[in-house]
């Protein structure tokens, strides 16, 4: 569960290393985001010569959350850290590679490009 002020790792090669959620998109009273949701983030830490720089405000798709994700078959999946992938206004990834596993819940939210770039889908 991601809310405002939550720090996330960046799971792509866009140049950002850490981002902070500044808004959860999807309604004025929406408080939490989970896997597959789009949030607005501020880049807090970036590498030199990356596509993004510190202070940039961008959209991101949440790909990993530390909170349990319940599935219809009763199984539960959770990750060690919160992570996101930076996207542009058309919801296409800014980076060209995705690092680490992503859950298959992204498929239901139509983030097929992220699914295809990911090395492992859980």
UniProtKB/Swiss-Prot annotation:
GO cellular component: cytosolic large ribosomal subunit
Family assignment from sequence similarity: Belongs to the universal ribosomal protein uL14 family.
Job description of the protein: Binds to 23S rRNA. Forms part of two intersubunit bridges in the 70S ribosome.
UniProt-listed CDD domains: Ribosomal_uL14
HAMAP family assigned to the protein according to its UniProt record, in alphabetical order: Ribosomal_uL14
NCBIfam families in UniProt: rplN_bact
Keywords associated with the record: Ribonucleoprotein, Ribosomal protein, RNA-binding, rRNA-binding
InterPro entries membership: Ribosomal_uL14 (IPR000218), Ribosomal_uL14_bac-type (IPR005745), Ribosomal_uL14_CS (IPR019972), Ribosomal_uL14_sf (IPR036853)
SUPFAM superfamilies: Ribosomal protein L14
GO biological process: translation
Protein's name in the database: Large ribosomal subunit protein uL14
Lineage: Bacteria, Pseudomonadati, Pseudomonadota, Alphaproteobacteria, Hyphomicrobiales
